[in-house]
Amino acid sequence: MFALLKDRLSDLDDLLLHDDSPKEAWALISDEKIMRRVIARELRRTANSLYTVDQEVVTADEKETDIRLRSALSKHEAVIELKLGNAKRSAKELLDTIEGQLVRKYMAAEHCKAGALLLTLAEDRQWQHPVEKRLIKADELLSLLIAQADRAQQVLGGGTYICVHLLDLRQ
């Protein structure tokens, strides 16, 4: 499921490169619920009967995952935690999302061993580095998030996979 998840996130990037891309329309979305719907619709469109797509599925501890891909061929699942990069979230909040939401809450199920933090970015912005307190841009934030995901994945051991994907909606 992890390979399929990563492929589908890459497909979103490819979609944004087409001349009939929804990039400009998606960049105008400032509500996470609406963004979740358009991304889920696109993931559903490209499913090819390999998986089903659920939105806001409630987990055993009453937490809601943003998007869940369920394999049509096995019990395996992958979860996507969506965050709008232009919202007022700090770099620390985004880093904490990996462990606090994605790993502990959404990937706790036995058959859910693949997860992604999907961060959209509609315009340039900066975040305060969580340790050094200096301002950083999207590329450095992405590096910090990937490193955090790698650490979380190592702690969980083999068979659990986490990625971070930046969906760049900037003009």
Regions found by a protein language model. Give the residues of each.
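Catalytic cores of nucleic-acid endonucleases
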Residues: 84-129
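Short, contiguous acidic/charged loop-to-helix segments that flank catalytic cores in large enzymes
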Residues: 23-30, 55-59, 86-96, 133-136
